[in-house]
């Protein structure tokens, strides 16, 4: 997912405020599910972030274009693990990694942890992150 950096994304120093990288990852995950046709309000279950490990490697600034890449690492009984990276494209299309995160999403139904059924697992495996 491609994102342009606007004033609202930056701090007083003109660089992207650190929590926005996590927001960009959330948008990319959500967009992948939406594009694949998943409607959580109709499915009866939803995912919540249960763990997040992040590494801030470099900064984006106003006007930059960044891209979020998402990769499914593991699909468990009641959760999934994703790796997400945010890249900045520079001169000659060189990629520079700005941010890396490993995110665990727990599957919930009615406010409680729930097993991911086989049809949902098949759906997740088909999502183009």
Map each language-model feature to its residues.
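Hot-dog-fold acyl-thioester-processing enzymes
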Residues: 1-50, 108-129
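Generic preference for hydrophobic/aromatic residues in regular secondary structure cores
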Residues: 46, 65-66
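Short structured motifs
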Residues: 50-56, 67-69
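HotDog/MaoC-like acyl-thioester-processing domains
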Residues: 56, 61-62, 73-129
């Amino acid at each position: 997912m491609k994102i342009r950096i606007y004033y609202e994304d930056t701090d007083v120093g003109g660089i992207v405020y650190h929590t926005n990288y996590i927001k960009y990852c959330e948008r990319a995950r959500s967009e992948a599910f939406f594009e694949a046709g998943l409607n959580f309000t109709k499915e009866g279950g939803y995912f919540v972030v249960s763990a997040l490990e992040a590494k801030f490697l470099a900064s984006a600034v106003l006007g930059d274009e960044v891209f979020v890449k998402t990769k499914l690492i593991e699909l468990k009984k009641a959760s999934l693990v994703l790796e997400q990276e945010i890249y900045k494209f520079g001169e000659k299309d060189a990629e520079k990694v700005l941010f890396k995160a490993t995110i665990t999403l727990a599957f919930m139904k009615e406010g409680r942890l729930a097993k991911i059924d086989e049809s949902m697992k098949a759906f997740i495996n088909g999502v183009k992150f």
